[in-house]
């Protein structure tokens, strides 16, 4: 199996005829050639020319070049011009496209996104690229053809439910099964925050564009991917007990100042970490309305954290300390709105003929009727996830979220928090609900 190469220059060296001449003119000539070639690597023909001394006869260099790779002339390492991944240590059974997809599943070329790629044969390229079923998230609207109200077999036709009982009624309904912890409406959270709360460094969570548009965008979409957040912790203080991977997993990226971190989703900031502070707990304690926390951990976890006497006392003490940011009057008003009861939440948008309690009952009955059995456990004790239930973005976890209003259930919680459009229908969503299968 091939392996990915990390911490290498952004472009591998291009082979030149070695001339023992250190004059400025010669160096300038080489630099100009190198720059020209790098600028042309969006062309398959140029990429193919870099394989003149490719050492592996059994690995198709044409297919490598066809799918965005060029030869770095360092061992058997190749690099994709479009996603930047470097792959080396190829083995006999390795194939270009599967290995490329394995190490860089979000490559825009493999996902059929719009790029400046210039193929030699566009039809040949189309034949070897992963099919649309493996490329749902990044497919162009023009290449994605499906029925407007289509949904995967066995999943909940949420759009039909929403049309009948209204969006807020669905939000008020909570979780999808009676055995799971209830999930609240995911709304705009407004908090001053920190482990103690960060003064001046925190902006309340707001949705971009305005709430009138109905569409959700994380505050820092560039850090929606966990690996992007992890890269910000290079200068993280090493004496702190909280490790970068723990903070990144909990949705935080490092601001580069002291021990201050921010949540990519709600924009809240935490600082002054104590040795016993656990990132997820602090996130849930101070930023309880954060949609990322709700998706990943659930409302029951948030309520449990808030109920812990020690944490509750710490939060109360921190809020009373001078110099700590406190939510403004406007924030308090919005916070009150987010904690409205189900009856208040649905009073404006639901048809008068459907009472909130009735909507909840209808929703639960539909969910119970369409619930899918829990995946079986094999003899080794590990749970095998059927392929049809895999997240259609990462293909590594079971899908467990529903995008609203389209109702498509195709992504795991972590991936759902990193996109702004439904991966299936490519339409912006206004909300995401955690789904529990019994």
UniProtKB/Swiss-Prot annotation:
Site (Cleavage): 162-163, 165-166
Ranges for region Disordered: 194-213, 322-346
Biased composition (Low complexity): 327-345
Keyword ATP-binding carried by entry: no
InterPro entries: BIR_rpt, IAP, Znf_RING, Znf_RING/FYVE/PHD
Intervals holding BIR repeats: 44-110, 226-293
Effect of residue 165 to D: Destroys cleavage site
Zinc finger regions, RING-type: 391-426
Top EC class of this enzyme: transferase
Reactions catalysed, as given in the entry: S-ubiquitinyl-[E2 ubiquitin-conjugating enzyme]-L-cysteine + [acceptor protein]-L-lysine = [E2 ubiquitin-conjugating enzyme]-L-cysteine + N(6)-ubiquitinyl-[acceptor protein]-L-lysine
Amino-acid positions noted as binding Zn(2+) in the UniProt annotation, renumbered to this chain: 263, 266, 283, 290
Annotated Gene Ontology cellular component terms: cytoplasm; cytosol; nucleus; perinuclear region of cytoplasm
A GO MF term: cysteine-type endopeptidase inhibitor activity
Post-translational modification: Ubiquitinated and degraded by HtrA2 in apoptotic cells; proteolytic cleavage at specific sites in the BIR domain linker region generating inactive fragments. Mutation of one site reduces but does not abolish cleavage as another site is selected by the protease.
Annotated Pfam families: BIR, zf-C3HC4_3
Oligomer and partners: Interacts (via BIR 2 domain) with Dronc (via residues 114-125). Rpr, hid and grim can outcompete Dronc for binding Diap1 therefore removing Diap1-mediated ubiquitination. Interacts (via BIR 2 domain) with HtrA2; this displaces any bound Dronc. Interacts with Strica. The N-terminally cleaved form interacts with Ubr3 (via UBR-type zinc finger); the interaction promotes the recruitment and uniquitination of substrate capases such as Dronc.
Known function: Anti-apoptotic protein which functions as a caspase regulator, using its E3 ubiquitin-protein ligase activity to smother caspase activity. Binds, ubiquitinates and inactivates initiator caspase Dronc, and effector caspases Drice and Dcp-1. Acts as a Nedd8-E3 ubiquitin-protein ligase for Drice. Suppresses apoptosis by targeting the apoptosome for ubiquitination and inactivation. Plays an important role in cell motility. Overexpression suppresses rpr and hid-dependent cell death in the eye.
Classification via PANTHER family: DEATH-ASSOCIATED INHIBITOR OF APOPTOSIS 1 (PTHR10044:SF174), INHIBITOR OF APOPTOSIS (PTHR10044)
Family: Belongs to the IAP family.
UniProt-recorded name of the protein: Death-associated inhibitor of apoptosis 1
Origin organism lineage: Eukaryota, Metazoa, Ecdysozoa, Arthropoda, Hexapoda
């Amino acid at each position: 199996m091939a392996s990915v190469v990390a911490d290498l220059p952004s472009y591998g060296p291009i082979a030149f005829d070695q001339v023992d001449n250190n004059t400025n003119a010669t160096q300038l000539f080489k630099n100009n050639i190198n720059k020209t070639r790098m600028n042309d690597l969006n062309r398959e023909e140029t990429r193919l020319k870099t394989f003149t001394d490719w050492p592996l006869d059994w690995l198709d260099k044409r297919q490598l070049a066809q799918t965005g790779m060029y030869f770095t002339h360092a061992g058997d390492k190749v690099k994709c011009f479009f996603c930047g991944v470097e792959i080396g240590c190829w083995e006999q059974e390795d194939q270009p496209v599967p290995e490329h997809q394995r190490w860089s599943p979000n490559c825009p070329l493999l996902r059929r996104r719009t790029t400046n790629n210039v193929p030699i044969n566009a039809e040949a390229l189309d034949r070897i690229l992963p099919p649309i079923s493996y490329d749902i998230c990044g497919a162009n609207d023009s290449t994605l053809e499906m029925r407007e109200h289509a949904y995967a077999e066995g999943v909940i036709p949420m759009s039909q439910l929403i049309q009948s009982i209204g969006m807020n009624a669905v939000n008020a309904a909570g979780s999808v099964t009676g055995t799971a912890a209830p999930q609240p409406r995911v709304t705009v959270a407004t908090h001053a925050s920190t482990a103690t709360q960060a003064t001046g460094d925190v902006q309340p969570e707001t949705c971009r564009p305005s709430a009138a548009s109905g569409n959700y965008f994380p505050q820092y979409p560039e850090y929606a991917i966990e690996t992007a957040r992890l890269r910000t912790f290079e200068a993280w203080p090493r004496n702190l007990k909280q490790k970068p991977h723990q903070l990144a997993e909990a949705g935080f990226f490092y601001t580069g100042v002291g021990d201050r971190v921010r949540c990519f989703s709600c924009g809240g900031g935490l600082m002054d970490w104590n040795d016993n502070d656990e990132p997820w707990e602090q996130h849930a304690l101070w930023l309880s309305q954060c949609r990322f926390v709700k998706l990943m951990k659930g409302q029951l976890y948030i309520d449990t954290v808030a109920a812990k006497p020690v944490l509750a006392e710490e939060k109360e003490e921190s809020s009373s300390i001078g110099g700590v940011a406190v939510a403004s009057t406007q924030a308090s008003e919005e916070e009150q709105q987010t904690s409205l009861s189900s009856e208040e939440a649905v009073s404006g948008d639901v048809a008068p003929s459907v009472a909130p309690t009735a909507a909840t009952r209808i929703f639960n009955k539909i969910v119970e009727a369409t619930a899918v059995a829990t995946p079986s456990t094999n003899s080794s004790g590990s749970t095998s996830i059927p392929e049809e239930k895999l997240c259609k973005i990462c293909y590594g976890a079971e899908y467990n979220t529903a995008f609203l209003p389209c109702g498509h259930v195709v992504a795991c919680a972590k991936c759902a928090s990193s996109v702004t459009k439904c991966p299936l229908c490519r339409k912006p969503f206004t909300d995401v609900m955690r789904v529990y299968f019994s």
